Amino acid sequence: MAVCPAPRRTPRTPQVTLSSPANPQPTARLALRTDQQEGIANTVRHLRRPHTRGHVVSACGTGKTLLALRASEELGVRHFAVAVPSLDLIAQWATAARADLRREPMITVSSLRAASHPVLAAAGADSTNAGEYLAYWLARHPRATVFFTFDSLSKIEEAQHSAVFPAPVFDLLVVDEAHATAGTWAKNWTALHDNSRIPADRRLYLTATPYVWEAPRLAEPPTTGPTPKRTTATAPHWDDPTLLATMDQPKIFGPRLHTYSHADAIDDGVLADYQLVVPTVTDDELRTTLTDPEAGPTARRTTALHLAILKAMREQDL
């Protein structure tokens, strides 16, 4: 990949902040689990060809970040870009990269100033909020990693389409929490999928939840009338949840390259198992517990729920 020529003019210095690592660095690379090794192998096999894309589905906390970092290494990626929905994730990615002994220059494109952020400063990351400076910075670094938020997508597009010195095409673009970009093309974030807007030789999408469902109704509607005795006939009817968005769209997200479910992670001891505690209060318990004739039906039921939660916490030693 050719390096961009030097710019005719440099942006103002306030648009970039420079920092250097201050904390002791790790000396050993992180060990990979079997599922991560399989995920990396599948990802590299598919993305070896340019102009390909694919997605990985793995439970939260199972190491998708490390999987993507190692895959980029095996693919020989030089200009590596990572898109995330939140500022906190930028810091997490930078920390994970340094913990895995990656030493390439890093820059963040967001509202964060790396020099003022303890994690990014410790990682030695630079930062900017200007697409023009990003293009100039990438021209000076033949191997580098760019972290940016979805909200800063326009700055990336600006850098790659600069008439003065366009930024190079990314060898690999990773989209974290990729389910947030699924759905209608009216979302600004869907520009991540468009190679004419954000040029990248390869795209890798990461998620733990490839399907986005409509939030269920968790409470009964308020009422001023008498509350009927709860029976099968009077119990609320819960409609089946509506699927709002899915990543099962190969033209956008590519094929699924690897799956590591929450259940598999629990079985393997990667994640802790959990128990679901459902507090309940019967109508008889409600009548004996609440005797205030002035309280409305909604207030009585709300109070009962509070008591049920306290009871469950006491019984479960929470």
Regions found by a protein language model. Name each.
Residues G131-V169:
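Conserved helix/coil segment N-terminal to the catalytic DExD/H
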Residues R49-S72:
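Walker A/P-loop
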Residues F150-S152, A163-Y205, T209-V212:
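SF2 helicase catalytic motif II
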Residues T17-H55:
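Conserved pre-motif I regulatory segment
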Residues R70, E74-L101, T108-R113, F150-S152:
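Conserved Walker A/P-loop ATP-binding site and its immediately adjacent core
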Residues P241-L318:
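Conserved interdomain linker/interface between the two RecA-like ATPase lobes of SF2 helicase motors
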Residues T108-N129, T149-K155, A180-G183:
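Conserved helicase motor
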Residues V57-G61, H179-T181, N195-P221, G225-W238, ...:
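Conserved helicase ATPase motor motifs in RecA-like P-loop NTPase domains
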